[in-house]
Curated annotation (Swiss-Prot):
Belongs to the SpoVG family. This is Putative septation protein SpoVG. Keywords: Cell cycle, Cell division, Septation. InterPro entries: SpoVG (IPR007170), SpoVG_sf (IPR036751). The gene is spoVG. It comes from the Bacteria. One of its GO terms (biological process) is division septum assembly. SUPFAM superfamilies: SpoVG-like. Could be involved in septation.
Length: 96
């Protein structure tokens, strides 16, 4: 299974959630609403989830093993950093 596309939508509001991401696998299957969160130990991803009646959050879709989670997280955070850096460069050029 290959990650063939990662689309990042940055969140403008202040807070721990930095972006919402869609990831396409093998140009055939997409998972939307993966969140990029800033935690105490740096950035991490949170898979799409829903709130149960008792207030608990359950993942809708998620990797089954650590290796796959790390692969997805690496691709998402890499693309997030690119988007973040591109916007910083654009903002600096506008200010000059």
């Amino acid at each position: 299974m290959q990650i063939t596309d990662v689309r990042v939508r940055k969140i403008a509001a202040e807070g721990k959630m930095k972006a919402i991401v869609s990831v396409t696998f093998d140009n055939e299957f997409v998972v939307h609403d993966i969140k990029v969160i800033e935690g105490q130990n740096g950035l991490f991803i949170a898979m799409p989830s829903r709130k149960t009646p008792d207030g608990e959050f359950k993942d809708i879709a998620h990797p089954i093993n650590t290796q796959t989670r790390e692969k997805i997280q690496k691709a998402i955070l890499g693309e997030y950093e690119k988007v973040k850096n591109e916007e910083t460069v654009t903002e600096e050029k506008v200010e000059e």
